[in-house]
């Protein structure tokens, strides 16, 4: 299913989140199970299914990484259940350095500045990846789709690192 069509949006990495939320509320009002309280069991079941579908679509389009994956799915490249590893050794080396930095924060004299520095570094790198990703997602070339998949994998790694940094920060300041 094309989630962009469901919300009457053009397929794009950049989505107007306010418009997305507005369309979500409209769709929810139209199919909410409460509207079908006096309907047949089949209509009630369909309403619940449609509501779940709308919720899934909204969560997917709201999240930039999932949105990028959905765009690739629409082009015939499925990433959601893959176990492919990254091939970019430079990125993997950088990731190892970041993980070492995460470990060192626990023993740092100035964890605040190291945490801020890592947040900035992660954000800057994710912005760079996103900049490279956007034109690949609109391309019709399969090679570009494969490269987009690699960029999405990197964004997933960055999101995990960001989560780890947040956990380290929470543990230090709790």
UniProtKB/Swiss-Prot annotation:
Gene3D superfamilies (alphabetical): DnaJ domain, HscB, C-terminal domain
Cellular-component GO terms for this entry: iron-sulfur cluster transfer complex
Keyword presence, tRNA processing: no
Gene of this entry: hscB
GO BP term (any one): [2Fe-2S] cluster assembly
Domain J: 2-74
Protein name (record): Co-chaperone protein HscB homolog
Alphabetically ordered keywords of this record: Chaperone
Molecular function per GO: ATPase activator activity; protein-folding chaperone binding
Function: Co-chaperone involved in the maturation of iron-sulfur cluster-containing proteins. Seems to help targeting proteins to be folded toward HscA.
Pfam families: HSCB_C (PF07743)
CDD domains: DnaJ
Subunit-level organization: Interacts with HscA and stimulates its ATPase activity.
Family: Belongs to the HscB family.
């Amino acid at each position: 299913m094309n989630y962009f069509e469901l919300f009457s949006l053009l397929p794009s990495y950049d989505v107007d989140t306010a418009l997305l939320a507005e369309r979500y509320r409209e769709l929810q009002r139209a199919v909410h199970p409460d509207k079908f309280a006096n309907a047949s069991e089949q209509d009630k079941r369909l309403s619940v299914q449609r509501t779940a579908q709308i919720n899934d679509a909204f969560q997917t389009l709201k999240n930039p990484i999932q949105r990028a994956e959905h765009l690739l799915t629409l082009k015939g490249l499925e990433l959601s259940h893959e176990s492919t590893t990254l091939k970019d050794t430079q990125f993997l080396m950088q990731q190892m350095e970041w993980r070492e930095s995460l470990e060192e924060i626990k023993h740092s004299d100035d964890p605040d500045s190291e945490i801020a520095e890592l947040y900035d570094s992660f954000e800057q790198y994710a912005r760079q990846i996103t900049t490279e990703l956007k034109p690949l997602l609109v391309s019709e070339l399969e090679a570009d789709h494969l490269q987009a998949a690699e960029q999405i994998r990197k964004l997933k790694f960055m999101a995990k690192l960001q989560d780890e940094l947040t956990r380290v920060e929470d543990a230090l300041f709790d």
